[in-house]
Swiss-Prot record:
It comes from Homo sapiens (Human). Transmembrane segments: none annotated. It is found in: Nucleus. Belongs to the activator 1 small subunits family. One of its GO terms (cellular component) is DNA replication factor C complex. GO terms for biological process: DNA repair; DNA replication; DNA-templated DNA replication; positive regulation of DNA-directed DNA polymerase activity. The modification N-acetylmethionine is found at residue 1. It comes from the Eukaryota. This is Replication factor C subunit 5. Subunit of the RFC complex, an heteropentameric complex consisting of a large subunit RFC1 and four small subunits RFC2, RFC3, RFC4 and RFC5; the RFC complex interacts with PCNA. Forms an heterotetrameric complex with RFC2, RFC3 and RFC4; this complex has ATPase activity but is not stimulated by PCNA. The heterotetramer of subunits RFC2, RFC3, RFC4 and RFC5 interacts with RAD17. Keywords: Acetylation, ATP-binding, DNA replication, Nucleotide-binding, Nucleus. GO terms for molecular function: ATP binding; ATP hydrolysis activity; DNA binding; enzyme binding. ATP binds at residues 60-67.
Amino acid sequence: METSALKQQEQPAATKIRNLPWVEKYRPQTLNDLISHQDILSTIQKFINEDRLPHLLLYGPPGTGKTSTILACAKQLYKDKEFGSMVLELNASDDRGIDIIRGPILSFASTRTIFKKGFKLVILDEADAMTQDAQNALRRVIEKFTENTRFCLICNYLSKIIPALQSRCTRFRFGPLTPELMVPRLEHVVEEEKVDISEDGMKALVTLSSGDMRRALNILQSTNMAFGKVTEETVYTCTGHPLKSDIANILDWMLNQDFTTAYRNITELKTLKGLALHDILTEIHLFVHRVDFPSSVRIHLLTKMADIEYRLSVGTNEKIQLSSLIAAFQVTRDLIVAEA
C-alpha cells in the first residue's frame, strides 16, 4: 500500500517537471551550472564565501542569466526549508508604485529572523520599471535595513535606475551570450528532449536569439512542438521572421521593379507569411551594411530607414511606411545610375 502511495506521489511530480517550459526546466540551479560571465560569478562566489555579500545591481539584455545568477546564490545561501522566510522575490513591473516599497518590501526587510543568523535577501526583478518615487523610497529602505537585509536589483536599462540607488549597489553588467557558449547548452537540451534538429536550424536559433538564451529555448520548444523538426525554414516560419530568400525577393522588387509592382508584391508576401515591416527593415539594414554602396547612397538609405523605424515605433500606419521604404530604395537606384 505504502509503495503504491509513493508511486502516486512521484507521478504528479514527474508530470509537473515534464510539463514545465524548457526555460524553467533547464534553468541553472547552482553558480557552476551557469555558462557565461565567469568573472562576475567568481566575484559573487567570493562575496558569499567571505559572508560579505553587498547590495547587488545586475543589468544587461534579457536572457543573459541575471535572475538565474541571484536565484542560484539564494539557493547556496539558504536551505530549502528556510528559503521562503529568508528570500522575497518580486517583479517590479507588476506593481511599479511606492505602495510595493511601503508594503511587502518594508514589512519583510524590517522583521528580523529569530532562528537564523545572517541577512534576508530581497530580489527585485525588472527594477527599471519602478517609478521615480518608488526608487527614492527604496533608497531609504536600503539605508535603514542594511544590517539584516540585502537587496538585489535586476534590470535591462541601467539609465532608468536613479543614481542614488546605483551608488548603493555593486554593479555587474551581463552582456549577450556568445554562440560558442549557447550552442553546447542548446545541444544538451536537444539531446535531453530528443529534438530532431538540422545544422542550419541550430544556426537560425542562435542568429534569431541574438545572445538571449531564454528566447533561444522558447523558439526551440515552440518550433519543435509546431513542426516536429527544427530547420532554418521552420524556425523562421514559427517566429514570423522573414527568410533570407524573402529578403532577397523584396530587395529585387524594390531595386528592379516599378513602385506599384514592388508595393503589390511585398504586400502580398507580407500577408501570405504574416511578416512585420519592422523585421523586414532589420534584415534590409544588415544588407545595406554588407553591400558596397557609394557613401552618399548608403547615408541616404540609412537616414530614411532610421526615420521609418522611428515612425513605426510610435504607431504610424505600416502601409505608408512600406511606401516610404520602397520610395527610398527607388531614389537610391536613381542615385546609383546617376553616379555610374
